[in-house]
Amino acid sequence: MKKFTAKTIKLPKDVDEKYSQMNYLKEISKNIGDIKDGEKDDFVMFGHIEPLYLKNCIKHFESLPENITNFIIKNYDVNKFNLIGQILQSKHPMIFQTFTQVMNGNIISLGCEFALHKKLFEEYYNWHVSVIADLMGGIPADVPVTKEEMTIINDILFTTYWICYGNVNKGSIFVV
């Protein structure tokens, strides 16, 4: 997997029409040059996602309500997530490190937008699918994984990809 670099851009609070989707993509993708109108289809917009960040990385987190972290800590089946942790630890140690941080409440979610060149999106997607397949292959069929739990797993996977294989060049993390 290639190692990428990226930049994080803080949006102004008074975002208005000038941040239409096209301008949005141009703004967050300056590290690969301006996107011409005809190149719009070369990029994938994730829309609104919620990757996870280390709680103490940014002072702004201090003002976030505790219930954001508490949701992650309290609202999951301990045995099920222990099982998921065991699968990750044996097959994907890097992801397991991020997983442990989430389960310990050291990581919280923050909404952001993400634009990625299609080629890199394919790499992320294929990696993500392979990890999910490993997880689902290790969880017994009679242990259902809820939508909320899958959301947490997906956030952990995206975060791990961003930390380990990102900070994704030719696409940028856009903190809002």
Region locations from a protein language model:
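ER/Golgi luminal nucleotide-sugar-dependent glycosyltransferases, focusing on the catalytic module
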Residues: 1-176
